[in-house]
């Protein structure tokens, strides 16, 4: 299968601070020492992925909109929220919204609920592109900011998206080709008009 680097497969993360009315753009990237200590998280990892020290690894804990490494995703989000929202008070950050653009099954959704609770959300609201009552053509950023009108206690939101969805398409097609080969369906795959 074609080799993909972590920055091609990683989700783009947007953190919305409803208190300051500011949005921060991040990447689902982490760099760890082989001892398990996290060195960096987010956008600052992008430039380092090609020049990693010998004792460290870089990867994405959220791939194709799904949590692929729960423990690392928790550490990464905790660091990002602390960076942008400050340290959580005793009761945590308050109510948080998770907005995911990919279609998720129940188990994948639960992973996001648990993640937000673990990083300090007191309550969690889940939303995706199936939100009802949104006028067609409304930018998703406006929808997420507007959620504060419905959920008055929202303190922050985390949006999981992909700015370059072509990377996801290339990866998904490469995986499909690999699976067809494994299943002995290469001839059928070649007949598909992809």
Task: Name every feature range the model reports, one short phrase each.
Residues 1-26, 32-37, 45-194:
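Nucleotide/phosphate-binding catalytic cleft detector across ATP-hydrolyzing
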């Amino acid at each position: 299968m074609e080799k993909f680097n972590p920055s091609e497969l990683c989700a783009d993360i947007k953190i919305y601070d409803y208190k300051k009315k500011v949005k921060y753009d991040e990447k689902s990237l982490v760099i760890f020492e082989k001892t398990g200590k996290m060195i960096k998280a987010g956008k600052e990892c992008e430039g380092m992925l090609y020049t990693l020290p010998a004792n460290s690894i870089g990867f994405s804990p959220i791939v194709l909109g799904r949590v692929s490494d729960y423990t690392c995703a928790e550490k990464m989000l905790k660091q990002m929220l602390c960076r942008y929202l400050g340290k959580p008070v005793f009761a945590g950050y308050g109510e948080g919204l998770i907005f995911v653009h990919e279609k998720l099954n129940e188990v994948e959704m639960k992973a996001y609920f648990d993640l937000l609770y673990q990083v300090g959300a007191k309550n969690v609201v889940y939303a995706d592109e199936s939100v009802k009552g949104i006028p067609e053509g409304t930018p998703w950023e406006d929808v997420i900011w507007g959620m504060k009108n419905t959920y008055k206690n929202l303190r922050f939101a985390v949006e999981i998206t992909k700015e370059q969805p072509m990377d996801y398409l290339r990866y998904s097609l490469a995986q499909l080709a690999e699976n067809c080969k494994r299943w002995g369906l290469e001839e059928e795959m070649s007949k598909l008009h992809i």
